[in-house]
Amino acid sequence: MITLEKGITRAGTGYAGKTWNILGQLYFPKAVTDSTFAFETNSEPGQFVPVHVHPTQDEFILVQEGVLDLKLDGVWVKAHAGDLVRMPRGIPHGCFNKSDKPARALFWVSPMQKLEALFNMLDNLADPAEVVRISAEHEVNFLPPEAND
């Protein structure tokens, strides 16, 4: 069982000094417990996470800087700094930085399930097909590429 430790995870750093590079995007874990997993992302212009589904987790995004284009259950929407995006489990969603400026956001899922283990395995992995395969083993299912249109 993973319990929450008191303290502060500083801006631009990850919990316990950890950082993941997942296909060029930097992820910083902020809080890790059995019930919740929170992480910060920094997305450069053009970076994205393709449409996928978390069948066993609810997910949230608090946009902290910039604008994110999201495809939520087949519909395109924009989230600006200060906006909170709510994504119930089972809803297809993808996150895209289509702007010409960096975006920063705090993501969290509940419960954690296998997401931290997945990010540990994806760190510095360069093959997108392998990312998709490993993700499916950790309860994150990517949709076919046309779902991103």
Where are these regions (language model features)?
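Short histidine-centered beta-strand/loop micro-motifs
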Residues: 28-31, 49-54, 96-98
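Conserved short histidine dyad/triad with adjacent acidic residue
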Residues: 23-24, 39-54
